[in-house]
C-alpha cells in the first residue's frame, strides 16, 4: 500500500479507538491488526493476518463514529495474496472558486458604490449652485413685484378678449365719429397687428407678455382719447412734432420704462447696447440691433440684427454677426453703419452692417480711453457715440478738458470731426448721456431704481444748465442710452434688459 493510504488508515484507527473509548460502542479494535502498516513493505504482514484484518474491518464497521467519516469502505485480495482496499472520502473540500467570485463581486460593487457616491457629491454641489440661483431669482422677482414694473403669467385668452373688445369699440367709433376718422382707422390697423402678434406669442415665446400688455394699455388710452374728443366735440390732440424734425423746445418728460425682453445672450451679459437704426432717407425702415458685450464688460464680439420689433420679440429671423475689435457699450448705429471704439485704442471705426466689415477707421483727437474718463458705474465707455436728428455725434473727454464732457459732430462717412464743444460737466459724474436735436442730455444715478436727467448742453446756442427729469429703471445700472429720431424713443440697456422710453418734448406755440 502507498504511504499516504497507510497514514489515513492509521488515523482512522486512532479515531475509531477514541470513539470506542468515549462512546463505549463495541469492543476495541486489536492493535495487532494495525501493527503491520508502518510502510510499503508491510503489505505481506497485512496479508498474513488477513483474517485479523477482516475482523478489524468488522470492528471498524461497528464503531459508529468512525463509520460516519466514510462514504464507502471495500477491500479485495489479488492473486498474489495482497489485500487492496479503496476509501472514498466525502466532498468536504473548501470552495475557493466561489470565494474568489464573491471577492470579485464585492470589488465591482465597491467600485460602483464609489462612482455613485461621487455622483451624489456632484449633485449636492449642483443643487447648492441652483439653490443660490433660485434665491437670486426670488430676490429679483420680489424687487419687480415691489416696483411699478410687474411680470404676470401670460393669459392669452384674457388678452384675446381685451383685443376683441377694442375691435368692437373701434367699429362703434367709426360708425359714430363725426369728424375725421384717420386716427380711428390707424387704431384699427394697430389692433389687427396686435391680434397677429398675440397669436405668434401664443405659439412661441410666452415671456414677453409685459410688452404686449403695455401696447394694449397704450391702445386703450388712445381709444379713450378718441371717445373723449367725440363726446366733447373737440379736435383730437395731435402727437408731438413730425419725426425727424426739431420744431420743439426740448425734452421735458419721459415715460415709465417698457421692458422689451432680456438680451439674447442671457443674464450674465450685463453690459451692452441696443437700439434702432435711423436713416434720414428711410426713417421708418430702421432695423433693430442688440450688441451685448462679453462677460468681461469690455469686448464687443457678437451682435444681432432684426428687421422688425416683432422678430426681436419672438427671437426669429435674426442675423448674428461677429467682430473682434469693439470695446465698451458706447456703440451706435446710423444709416446702416455701426460705430464702435476700437479695442484698447483711442481709434473709432465705422462697420458696414451689410458686409460686417470695417469701412473706415479714424483716431479721435486727444480722446482719453481705456477707463480714463468713463461714466459712473460703467467701465470702458470713455468714447460714447450718439445719433439724433442732425446726424452722428461722439461724447468723450480729454486730458485738456480735465475730464469734462467734450461733444464732437462727426462726418458719418469719413469720421472726420466737423465741430467740437466743451462742457463744464465732469464725465465720470454722469451715468450716461444722449443727444436730441443737437442738445446733450446727461443722466445720473439717484438710487437703484431711479435715474435723473440732470444736465443739458445745447450745441445750437452754447447754453448749458440743470434739469430734474425723473427716469425710472428696472435694474441698478444703466449701461447705454441710444435715441432714435423717428419714433422719439430712448433705447436703454439696463443690466442685461432691453428697455425703451417715450420722450415728451415742449410744444412750441403755432
Curated annotation (Swiss-Prot):
One cellular component (GO) term of this entry: plasma membrane
Span of the signal peptide: 1-20
Keyword vocabulary terms for this entry: Cell adhesion, Coiled coil, Disulfide bond, Glycoprotein, Mitochondrion, Secreted, Signal
Short name of one Pfam family: OLF
Record note on what altering residue 246 to A does: Abolishes secretion. No effect on multimer formation
Keyword presence, Glycoprotein: yes
Domain observations: The olfactomedin-like domain is involved in the interaction with cadherin.
Name of the molecule in the record: Olfactomedin-4
Organism: Homo sapiens (Human)
Amino acid at each position: 500500500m502507498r504511504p499516504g493510504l497507510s497514514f489515513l488508515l492509521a488515523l482512522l484507527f486512532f479515531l475509531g479507538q477514541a470513539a470506542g473509548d468515549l462512546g463505549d460502542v463495541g469492543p476495541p479494535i486489536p492493535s495487532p491488526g494495525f501493527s503491520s502498516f508502518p510502510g510499503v513493505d508491510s503489505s505481506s504482514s497485512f496479508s498474513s493476518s488477513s483474517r485479523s484484518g477482516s475482523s478489524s474491518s468488522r470492528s471498524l464497521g461497528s464503531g459508529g463514529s468512525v463509520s460516519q467519516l466514510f462514504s464507502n469502505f471495500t477491500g479485495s485480495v489479488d492473486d498474489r495474496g495482497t489485500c487492496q482496499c479503496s476509501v472514498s472520502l466525502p466532498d468536504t473540500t473548501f470552495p475557493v472558486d466561489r470565494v474568489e467570485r464573491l471577492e470579485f463581486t464585492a470589488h465591482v460593487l465597491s467600485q460602483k458604490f464609489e462612482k455613485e457616491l461621487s455622483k451624489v457629491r456632484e449633485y449636492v454641489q449642483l443643487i447648492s449652485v441652483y439653490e443660490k440661483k433660485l434665491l437670486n431669482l426670488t430676490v429679483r422677482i420680489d424687487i419687480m413685484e415691489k416696483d411699478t414694473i410687474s411680470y404676470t403669467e401670460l393669459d392669452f385668452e384674457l388678452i384675446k378678449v381685451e383685443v376683441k373688445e377694442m375691435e368692437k369699440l373701434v367699429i362703434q367709433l367709426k360708425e359714430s365719429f363725426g369728424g375725421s376718422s384717420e386716427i380711428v382707422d390707424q387704431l384699427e390697423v394697430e389692433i389687427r397687428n396686435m391680434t397677429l402678434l398675440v397669436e405668434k406669442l401664443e405659439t412661441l415665446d410666452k415671456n414677453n407678455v409685459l410688452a404686449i400688455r403695455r401696447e394694449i394699455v397704450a391702445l386703450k388710452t388712445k381709444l379713450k382719447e378718441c371717445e373723449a374728443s367725440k363726446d366733447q366735440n373737440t379736435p383730437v390732440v395731435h402727437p408731438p412734432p413730425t419725426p425727424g424734425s426739431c420744431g420743439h423746445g426740448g425734452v421735458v418728460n419721459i415715460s415709465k420704462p417698457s421692458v422689451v425682453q432680456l438680451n439674447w445672450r442671457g443674464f450674465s451679459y450685463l453690459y451692452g447696447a441696443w437700439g434702432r437704426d435711423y436713416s434720414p432717407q428711410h426713417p421708418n425702415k430702421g432695423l433693430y440691433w442688440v450688441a451685448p458685450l462679453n462677460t468681461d464688460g469690455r469686448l464687443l464680439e457678437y451682435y444681432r440684427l432684426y428687421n422688425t420689433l416683432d422678430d426681436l420679440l419672438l427671437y426669429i429671423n435674426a442675423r448674428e454677426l461677429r467682430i473682434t475689435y469693439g470695446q465698451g457699450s458706447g456703440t451706435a448705429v446710423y444709416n446702416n453703419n455701426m460705430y464702435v471704439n476700437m479695442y484698447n485704442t483711442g481709434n473709432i471705426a465705422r462697420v458696414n452692417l451689410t458686409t460686417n466689415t470695417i469701412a473706415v477707421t479714424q483716431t479721435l483727437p486727444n480722446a482719453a480711453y481705456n477707463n480714463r474718463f468713463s461714466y459712473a458705474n460703467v467701465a470702458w465707455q470713455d468714447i460714447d457715440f450718439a445719433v439724433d436728428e442732425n446726424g452722428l455725434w461722439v461724447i468723450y473727454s480729454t486730458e485738456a478738458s480735465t475730464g469734462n464732457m467734450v461733444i464732437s459732430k462727426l462726418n458719418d462717412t469719413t469720421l472726420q470731426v466737423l465741430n467740437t464743444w466743451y462742457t463744464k460737466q465732469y464725465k465720470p459724474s454722469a451715468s450716461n448721456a444722449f443727444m436730441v436735436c443737437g442738445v446733450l442730455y446727461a443722466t445720473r444715478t439717484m438710487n437703484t431704481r431711479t435715474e435723473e436727467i440732470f444736465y443739458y448742453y445745447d450745441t445750437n446756442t452754447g447754453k448749458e444748465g440743470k434739469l430734474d427729469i425723473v427716469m425710472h429703471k428696472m435694474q441698478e445700472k444703466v449701461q447705454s442710452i441710444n435715441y432714435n429720431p423717428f419714433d422719439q424713443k430712448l433705447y436703454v440697456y439696463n443690466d442685461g434688459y432691453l428697455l425703451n422710453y417715450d420722450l415728451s418734448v415742449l410744444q412750441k406755440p403755432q
